[in-house]
Amino acid sequence: MLKSIHHVAIIVSDYEKSKHFYSVILGLKIVAEHFRKERNSYKLDLAVNEVYQIELFSFPSPPLRLSFPEATGLRHLAFSVENLEEVLKHLKK
């Protein structure tokens, strides 16, 4: 049976901005980065505590997600943290 979540895949609208946010601001480790020429897109694998992964995908002109929370697709991604106040302070810098 299922033991845990292995990874979450997210299609991003701005690859470089998202790469910076997840790797620099959140401090996730870049495991692999690939440019897929045939799709003109990037795939970035990020490690979360060496246990889980977040995959960021970029595509040229991806369709925007509807602005309704009930729309199909990833609704949100939640992280557990040691100290919420410290994390909020860090993110606001």
Model-identified regions with their sequence ranges:
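Core segments of cupin and vicinal oxygen chelate
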Residues: 2, 11-53
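Core-facing hydrophobic residues within beta-strands of well-ordered domains
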Residues: 2-5, 74
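Short aromatic/hydrophobic contact patches that present stacked aromatics
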Residues: 7-9, 45, 76-78
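Vicinal oxygen chelate
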Residues: 12-16, 69-93
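Short Gly/Pro-enriched turn/cap motifs at secondary-structure boundaries
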Residues: 35, 68-69
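Residue-level detector of transmembrane insertion/anchoring sites
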Residues: 45, 65-66
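Conserved beta-strand in the GNAT
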Residues: 55-57
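Conserved short histidine dyad/triad with adjacent acidic residue
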Residues: 60-63
